Amino acid sequence: MACFDVAIIGGGISGVGIAQYAAAAGYSTLLIEKGEIGGQTSANSSKLIHGGLRYLETGQINLVRKSLLERRHLLNLAPSLVKAVPFYIPVYDNSQRSPWTIRAGLSMYALLSEFDPLGQFVSVPAVHWHRFKGLKLSGLKAVFQYWDAQTDDKLLTQAVARSAQALGAEVYAEA
């Protein structure tokens, strides 16, 4: 019977990430998944690799900075799996946050991204608002566009598992 320094149960993104890290650090590593790698919780995520914009509101500055940095790393490391996607924030007369507040938050986001192009935002001119299908124009005060990233979470999880294996981890799935 083989002995391992590290045994991981669960082949979601956390499990395969730990396996990859442990194998890279030189630990003999075993990962066991009862089903398909990335086939459970990790396959049912929001599919976003987000920079943490929403965490600015609660003052989690370091988390936003770290999220933006990790997003940048993933975009660089796995460009075939992680893609930049534009997001839009409409601000209405009755919105909880004013255009000024949204602009301030997006400016902080840009600063925390260290002015990475994907940390930047624009205020979409009113003459272009009609181009957004389904956008209610009545009471609309502003529209901001910023960037985040999206992935196929299952494929990303499987790629990390293959990397863990290449680093020496033993991975058993559908056991």
Region annotations inferred by a language model:
Residues 47-133:
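Dinucleotide-binding Rossmann-like beta1-alpha1 core, especially the glycine-rich loop
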Residues 1-14:
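Beta1/beta-strand and adjacent pyrophosphate-binding region of the FAD-binding site
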Residues 129-167:
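Helix-loop-beta segment of a Rossmann-like dinucleotide-binding subdomain
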Residues 168-175:
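A conserved beta-strand/loop element that lines the FAD pocket in flavoprotein oxidoreductases
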Residues 19, 23-24, 163:
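Gly/Ala-rich phosphate-binding loop of Rossmann-like dinucleotide-binding domains
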Residues 17, 50-51, 155, 159:
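Short amphipathic alpha-helical face segments that pack within enzyme cores
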Residues 23-43:
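Glycine-rich FAD pyrophosphate-binding loop
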